[in-house]
Curated annotation (Swiss-Prot):
<dbReference type="InterPro" id="IPR002803">
    <property type="entry name" value="FBPase_V"/>
</dbReference>
<feature type="binding site">
    <location>
        <position position="266"/>
    </location>
    <ligand>
        <name>dihydroxyacetone phosphate</name>
    </ligand>
</feature>
<feature type="binding site">
    <location>
        <position position="232"/>
    </location>
    <ligand>
        <name>Mg(2+) 3</name>
    </ligand>
</feature>
<feature type="binding site" description="in other chain">
    <location>
        <position position="297"/>
    </location>
    <ligand>
        <name>beta-D-fructose 1,6-bisphosphate</name>
    </ligand>
</feature>
<feature type="binding site" description="in other chain">
    <location>
        <begin position="104"/>
        <end position="105"/>
    </location>
    <ligand>
        <name>beta-D-fructose 1,6-bisphosphate</name>
    </ligand>
</feature>
<dbReference type="GO" id="GO:0004332">
    <property type="term" value="F:fructose-bisphosphate aldolase activity"/>
</dbReference>
<dbReference type="GO" id="GO:0042132">
    <property type="term" value="F:fructose 1,6-bisphosphate 1-phosphatase activity"/>
</dbReference>
<feature type="binding site" description="in other chain">
    <location>
        <position position="358"/>
    </location>
    <ligand>
        <name>beta-D-fructose 1,6-bisphosphate</name>
    </ligand>
</feature>
<feature type="binding site">
    <location>
        <position position="133"/>
    </location>
    <ligand>
        <name>dihydroxyacetone phosphate</name>
    </ligand>
</feature>
<dbReference type="GO" id="GO:0006094">
    <property type="term" value="P:gluconeogenesis"/>
</dbReference>
<feature type="binding site">
    <location>
        <position position="297"/>
    </location>
    <ligand>
        <name>dihydroxyacetone phosphate</name>
    </ligand>
</feature>
<comment type="subunit">
    <text>Homooctamer; dimer of tetramers.</text>
</comment>
<feature type="binding site">
    <location>
        <position position="18"/>
    </location>
    <ligand>
        <name>dihydroxyacetone phosphate</name>
    </ligand>
</feature>
<feature type="binding site" description="in other chain">
    <location>
        <position position="91"/>
    </location>
    <ligand>
        <name>beta-D-fructose 1,6-bisphosphate</name>
    </ligand>
</feature>
<feature type="binding site">
    <location>
        <position position="234"/>
    </location>
    <ligand>
        <name>Mg(2+) 2</name>
    </ligand>
</feature>
<feature type="binding site">
    <location>
        <position position="52"/>
    </location>
    <ligand>
        <name>Mg(2+) 1</name>
    </ligand>
</feature>
<dbReference type="Pfam" id="PF01950">
    <property type="entry name" value="FBPase_3"/>
</dbReference>
Amino acid sequence: MRVTVSIIKADVGGFPGHAHVHPKMLEYAAAKLKEAQKRGVIIDYFVYNVGDDISLLMTHTKGEDNKDIHGLAWETFKEVTDQIAKRFKLYGAGQDLLKDAFSGNIRGMGPQVAEMEFEERPSEPIIAFAADKTEPGAFNLPLYKMFADPFTTAGLVIDPSMHEGFIFEVLDVVEHKVYLLKTPEDAYSLLGLIGTTGRYIIRKVFRRADGAPAAANSVERLSLIAGRYVGKDDPVLLVRAQSGLPAVGEVLEAFAHPHLVHGWMRGSHAGPLMPARFISVDPERRIAIGPKMTRFDGPPKVGALGFQLHEGYLEGGVDLFDDPAFDYVRQTAAQIADYIRRMGPFQPHRLPPEEMEYTALPKILAKVKPYPADQYEKDRKKYIEAVVKGAKVEESQHD
């Protein structure tokens, strides 16, 4: 059976602030998707959150970028915004919905999208990841570890079906170019690109032996769409596992080190990506309530739900980070967060200028008047005296 798995995610209101979502939002979204399932639009679904973002996991046979599936997601997010978020005056109601009306494809309209179409195998494990308070490039390092690092994925060495390696599809989100790199031989070139996480983002991974899709990552950059800061992108990631692909445990091993990512408070700080537990997972209701974002609106967190796909139906989910094996990782992330928070507004905790241009910082800096250095150096005393007296140096004196 040929099946498509789609994850479409949006922040349509925080409760309170940017910490979490209102439970009624998840319930409304699940009811909306259940109705679509009854109409035959989708085969199955699951609704979950990480922080203040709602993810809609849907299976169907309509292929990627399908207007019916994207339209269903858009309509669901709009109704959740209008019926729940605005009624309860939730923070940032509808903030990821950057357009007024749906135009056939949800890409470029604000929500994050990760989709894969493939032939369902005799056993089809899939893992749906979602991260909050970070950007799509946050998954670059884990994806590299899963599919190109033999110290993470032993199958690259000992599984003949994986030994040929993988093909990485990398998107340059600034110049809108696509790179296709093969591992292991292109590994150094690949790292040269994806180490710049804000620009070069791994969008897809394919098995090199037969071109089978292995992973799909969302790549929408909200600030590049809106031209202003409207919240961090908060990506979603879909990974297939086992039988010629990394095992479930190898996929999860990629998150065993809480690497630094961009985002966190006001989308302006670097912090550790913490693999977090879900508060509750209810397969019967098709809802999972994810972790809250607390300290400094974070730290950045990622959740993982595992499913077995059968004839397009989702068996699960299983909270894959809900295990003592990840307790030490979480503790390490907390220690890293504590260390880097002590740097306050200084880099490298605060992001570099090019990452700050879509925040409110340029407006703050515009209020601070600089002086030409050559003029200032000639008569420093005059400038200092003017500041002491609360006076302004005349424009003609330094222009």
